[in-house]
């Protein structure tokens, strides 16, 4: 999706998203609901109601709470943003199914842990649970034959990390 979005708008930023509007976003497969959420988020940033730069100065919990105040952003999306975009070191998206299954596989559990169980399992990995999440995601994808060899020419600045 990111590649399609980038092809549509060029530099993915709030102004360019607003410039495409709903029709542009829908033309690349963004659902009506997600288009509304994206455009509302872009509008919040452009209007100054949301300053994403200030999230860096907050705790993980406060930054997550601020993001989740926005319509369409739940815990998974907030955690993914904090982990991938802001690179907070102690984010562990316990609601992520691949992370739940991957953790069960990596630590040898018979059942897939629920989010509250996964939170407890991740405590020993503090304060670098984001690194643990990336390792577990990689193991999850590798077990399923979905890890592609690294491309040394890839533009790492614009390729979002995390599972496909």
What spans do the regions from the language model cover?
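Alpha-helical ds-nucleic-acid-binding substructure associated with the helix-hairpin-helix region
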Residues: 1-71
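C-terminal accessory module of base-excision DNA glycosylases/AP lyases that mediates lesion recognition
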Residues: 36, 56, 60, 75-164
């Amino acid at each position: 999706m990111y590649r399609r979005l980038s092809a549509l708008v060029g530099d993915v930023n709030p102004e360019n998203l607003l410039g495409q509007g709903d029709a542009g976003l829908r033309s690349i497969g963004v659902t009506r609901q997600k288009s509304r959420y994206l455009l509302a988020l872009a509008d919040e940033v452009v209007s100054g109601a949301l300053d994403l730069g200030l999230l860096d100065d907050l705790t993980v919990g406060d930054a997550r709470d601020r993001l989740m105040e926005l319509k369409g952003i739940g815990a998974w999306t907030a955690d993914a943003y904090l982990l991938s975009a802001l690179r907070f070191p102690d984010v562990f998206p316990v609601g992520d199914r691949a992370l739940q299954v991957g953790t069960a596989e990596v630590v040898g559990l018979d059942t897939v842990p629920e989010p509250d169980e996964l939170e407890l399992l991740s405590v020993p990995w503090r304060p670098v649970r984001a690194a643990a999440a990336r390792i577990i995601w990689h193991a999850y994808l590798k077990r399923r034959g979905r890890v592609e060899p690294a491309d040394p020419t890839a533009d790492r600045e614009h390729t979002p990390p995390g599972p496909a």
